[in-house]
Amino acid sequence: MQIENHKEEVPFAHYCERFAALDPQEAAARTGTPFENGAFRITLLGHPYRITHPEFSISGEGGTALKSLPAQTFLMRWLLEGKQTAGSRDFLTFREMPWGELYIQPFTGRVLQRAAFSFGTRLEAFRAACTAMGGLPLQAGDAGFEFTLLGNYRLRMLLWAGDDEFPPSAQLLYSAN
Protein backbone atom coordinates (compact mmCIF):
# COMPACT_ATOMS: atom_id res chain seq x y z
CA MET A 1 0.00 0.00 0.00
CA GLN A 2 1.39 3.38 -0.96
CA ILE A 3 0.84 5.96 1.75
CA GLU A 4 -0.78 9.14 0.47
CA ASN A 5 -1.65 10.87 3.73
CA HIS A 6 1.18 10.49 6.24
CA LYS A 7 -0.67 12.44 8.92
CA GLU A 8 -3.49 9.86 9.02
CA GLU A 9 -2.30 6.64 7.39
CA VAL A 10 1.03 6.24 9.20
CA PRO A 11 -0.48 6.43 12.71
CA PHE A 12 -3.37 4.21 11.60
CA ALA A 13 -0.96 1.51 10.33
CA HIS A 14 1.11 1.76 13.53
CA TYR A 15 -1.92 1.23 15.76
CA CYS A 16 -3.24 -1.60 13.55
CA GLU A 17 -0.02 -3.52 14.29
CA ARG A 18 -0.36 -2.90 18.02
CA PHE A 19 -4.07 -3.76 17.90
CA ALA A 20 -3.36 -7.18 16.37
CA ALA A 21 -1.24 -8.06 19.43
CA LEU A 22 -3.83 -6.78 21.92
CA ASP A 23 -5.27 -9.17 24.52
CA PRO A 24 -8.99 -8.56 23.88
CA GLN A 25 -10.15 -9.87 27.26
CA GLU A 26 -7.76 -7.53 29.10
CA ALA A 27 -8.87 -4.58 26.94
CA ALA A 28 -12.54 -5.40 27.53
CA ALA A 29 -12.02 -5.50 31.31
CA ARG A 30 -9.92 -2.30 31.37
CA THR A 31 -12.21 -0.21 29.14
CA GLY A 32 -15.59 -1.69 29.97
CA THR A 33 -16.09 -2.45 26.26
CA PRO A 34 -17.88 -5.75 25.61
CA PHE A 35 -15.93 -8.32 23.56
CA GLU A 36 -17.65 -11.40 22.18
CA ASN A 37 -17.53 -13.50 19.02
CA GLY A 38 -14.24 -11.89 17.95
CA ALA A 39 -15.47 -8.30 18.11
CA PHE A 40 -15.71 -5.33 20.45
CA ARG A 41 -19.00 -3.46 20.64
CA ILE A 42 -18.39 0.22 21.25
CA THR A 43 -20.48 3.40 21.11
CA LEU A 44 -18.93 6.67 19.95
CA LEU A 45 -21.07 9.82 20.15
CA GLY A 46 -24.21 7.71 20.34
CA HIS A 47 -23.39 5.52 17.33
CA PRO A 48 -22.76 1.81 17.97
CA TYR A 49 -19.87 0.13 16.16
CA ARG A 50 -18.47 -3.38 15.89
CA ILE A 51 -14.66 -3.65 15.81
CA THR A 52 -13.20 -7.03 14.87
CA HIS A 53 -10.03 -8.43 16.43
CA PRO A 54 -7.22 -9.36 15.73
CA GLU A 55 -7.58 -7.84 12.26
CA PHE A 56 -9.01 -4.37 12.71
CA SER A 57 -12.18 -3.65 10.81
CA ILE A 58 -15.03 -1.47 11.89
CA SER A 59 -18.67 -1.53 10.87
CA GLY A 60 -21.56 0.52 12.07
CA GLU A 61 -24.63 -1.07 13.48
CA GLY A 62 -27.77 0.07 11.76
CA GLY A 63 -25.96 1.11 8.59
CA THR A 64 -23.79 3.91 9.99
CA ALA A 65 -20.22 3.92 8.73
CA LEU A 66 -17.11 5.36 10.34
CA LYS A 67 -14.85 6.21 7.43
CA SER A 68 -12.63 8.77 9.18
CA LEU A 69 -9.14 7.33 9.81
CA PRO A 70 -8.53 9.69 12.77
CA ALA A 71 -11.78 8.49 14.39
CA GLN A 72 -10.85 4.84 13.75
CA THR A 73 -7.37 5.49 15.17
CA PHE A 74 -8.98 7.12 18.22
CA LEU A 75 -11.07 3.99 18.87
CA MET A 76 -8.04 1.72 18.44
CA ARG A 77 -6.09 3.86 20.90
CA TRP A 78 -9.00 3.66 23.34
CA LEU A 79 -8.91 -0.13 23.20
CA LEU A 80 -5.10 -0.17 23.47
CA GLU A 81 -4.61 2.45 26.19
CA GLY A 82 -7.95 3.65 27.57
CA LYS A 83 -9.43 3.07 31.01
CA GLN A 84 -13.05 3.22 32.00
CA THR A 85 -13.62 5.53 34.95
CA ALA A 86 -16.56 6.61 37.02
CA GLY A 87 -18.48 9.56 35.62
CA SER A 88 -17.84 13.09 36.83
CA ARG A 89 -20.10 16.09 37.28
CA ASP A 90 -17.14 18.43 36.83
CA PHE A 91 -15.93 19.70 33.47
CA LEU A 92 -12.59 21.11 32.34
CA THR A 93 -11.56 23.40 29.52
CA PHE A 94 -8.90 22.24 27.07
CA ARG A 95 -6.37 24.53 28.77
CA GLU A 96 -6.99 22.76 32.11
CA MET A 97 -6.07 19.36 30.66
CA PRO A 98 -2.51 18.15 31.40
CA TRP A 99 -1.41 18.86 27.81
CA GLY A 100 -3.73 21.80 27.24
CA GLU A 101 -1.33 24.69 27.63
CA LEU A 102 1.02 23.21 25.04
CA TYR A 103 -1.66 22.88 22.32
CA ILE A 104 -4.05 25.70 23.26
CA GLN A 105 -3.25 27.90 20.25
CA PRO A 106 -3.93 25.27 17.54
CA PHE A 107 -6.98 24.01 19.47
CA THR A 108 -8.39 27.52 19.74
CA GLY A 109 -8.03 28.12 16.01
CA ARG A 110 -9.10 24.72 14.74
CA VAL A 111 -11.97 24.10 17.13
CA LEU A 112 -13.23 27.08 19.11
CA GLN A 113 -12.86 29.85 16.52
CA ARG A 114 -14.09 27.59 13.74
CA ALA A 115 -17.22 26.70 15.74
CA ALA A 116 -17.80 30.31 16.77
CA PHE A 117 -17.54 31.72 13.27
CA SER A 118 -19.37 28.83 11.59
CA PHE A 119 -22.37 28.98 13.92
CA GLY A 120 -22.08 32.23 15.92
CA THR A 121 -24.71 33.95 13.79
CA ARG A 122 -26.66 30.75 13.09
CA LEU A 123 -27.77 29.40 16.47
CA GLU A 124 -30.66 27.40 14.98
CA ALA A 125 -28.28 25.62 12.59
CA PHE A 126 -26.00 24.85 15.56
CA ARG A 127 -28.95 23.47 17.56
CA ALA A 128 -30.08 21.37 14.60
CA ALA A 129 -26.57 19.96 14.04
CA CYS A 130 -26.07 19.14 17.72
CA THR A 131 -29.51 17.54 17.99
CA ALA A 132 -28.82 15.44 14.88
CA MET A 133 -25.58 14.25 16.54
CA GLY A 134 -27.51 13.14 19.63
CA GLY A 135 -26.61 16.10 21.83
CA LEU A 136 -28.70 16.92 24.87
CA PRO A 137 -29.58 20.62 25.24
CA LEU A 138 -28.06 22.55 28.15
CA GLN A 139 -29.01 25.81 29.80
CA ALA A 140 -25.57 27.31 29.15
CA GLY A 141 -24.27 29.86 26.66
CA ASP A 142 -26.70 31.08 24.05
CA ALA A 143 -26.84 27.45 22.94
CA GLY A 144 -25.19 24.49 24.60
CA PHE A 145 -25.23 20.71 24.21
CA GLU A 146 -23.78 17.73 26.03
CA PHE A 147 -22.58 14.60 24.23
CA THR A 148 -21.54 11.19 25.49
CA LEU A 149 -18.20 10.71 23.77
CA LEU A 150 -17.28 7.20 24.90
CA GLY A 151 -18.32 5.27 28.00
CA ASN A 152 -18.54 7.69 30.93
CA TYR A 153 -16.62 10.42 29.09
CA ARG A 154 -18.75 13.41 28.12
CA LEU A 155 -18.17 16.72 26.43
CA ARG A 156 -20.09 19.96 26.25
CA MET A 157 -20.15 22.40 23.35
CA LEU A 158 -21.22 25.93 24.25
CA LEU A 159 -21.82 28.77 21.81
CA TRP A 160 -22.38 32.49 22.32
CA ALA A 161 -23.82 34.48 19.42
CA GLY A 162 -22.00 37.45 18.03
CA ASP A 163 -23.54 40.91 17.94
CA ASP A 164 -22.55 44.49 17.12
CA GLU A 165 -20.37 44.71 20.21
CA PHE A 166 -18.80 41.26 20.62
CA PRO A 167 -17.72 38.56 18.18
CA PRO A 168 -19.19 35.06 18.54
CA SER A 169 -17.37 32.67 20.85
CA ALA A 170 -17.42 28.99 21.69
CA GLN A 171 -16.14 26.69 24.42
CA LEU A 172 -15.66 22.93 24.55
CA LEU A 173 -15.65 21.32 27.99
CA TYR A 174 -14.51 17.79 28.86
CA SER A 175 -15.75 15.69 31.77
CA ALA A 176 -13.11 15.74 34.51
CA ASN A 177 -12.83 11.96 34.66
Q: Predicted segment positions?
A:
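Short, charged/polar micro-motifs that form catalytic or ligand-binding hotspots
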Residues: 61, 65, 116, 143, ...
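Intrinsically disordered, low-complexity regulatory segments enriched in Ser/Thr/Pro
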Residues: 47-73, 160-177
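Amphipathic, interaction-prone secondary-structure segments
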Residues: 27-53, 136-161
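Conserved binding-pocket/active-site segment within a compact domain
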Residues: 120-177
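Short Lys/Arg-enriched alpha/beta "domain-start" segment
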Residues: 1-38, 71, 78-133
